[in-house]
Amino acid sequence: ISFEVKKGEVVGFLGPNGSGKTTTMRILTGYLPPSTGTASIAGFNTMTDSLDARRHIGYLPETVPLYTDMTVEDYLKFLGTIRGMRKEHLKRRIDSAIERVKLGDYRKSFISKLSKGYRQRTGLAQAILHEPEVLILDEPTVGIDPVQVVETRQLIKELGREQTLLLSTHILPE
């Protein structure tokens, strides 16, 4: 496939299970090499300039890798530190990410105690934590309740005004 997404655009990959949506997302995030050709994010090749490309990406994989023995806040602090965010900036960004995904009542909760929907929100919070230019969301509403689906769709619309956003789904209304 060949495509370009401009800043501020929202692009969705729609298709049945096994159609290559997740594979495409993994190629774009640098987790898988393309079988032919190249993939680039913000002008950086995802294979040869992987770290530079990843600095511009917020990624929510279909199955969010979470440290369930951490609280939501500690998890975000840990990931922000790994990303090299300055301590004074990190506190503000954690507060903002938690507010955006409506996790305020759960910031001190252990991830192991959260429902699937709130774990998904935690994953989304880590994806937006560093204010990336490009958000890549793989099946962002899978397995969450109908109210959270509506809230997540609304947040995606808001984020799409600010960032380039790619998402995958096999649900047509998405």
Role assignments for model-derived ranges:
Residues 135-139, 144:
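Catalytic Walker B motif of ABC-type/P-loop ATPase nucleotide-binding domains
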Residues 129-133, 162:
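A short, proline-enriched helix->beta-strand linker immediately N-terminal to the Walker B motif
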Residues 77, 81, 88-106:
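Conserved ABC ATPase "signature" region
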Residues 29:
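Helix-to-loop junction immediately C-terminal to a conserved catalytic motif
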Residues 124:
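Hydrophobic anchor residue at the start of the ABC signature
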Residues 37-48, 52-53:
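Conserved ABC transporter NBD signature motif
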Residues 149-162:
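Helical segment within the ABC ATPase nucleotide-binding domain
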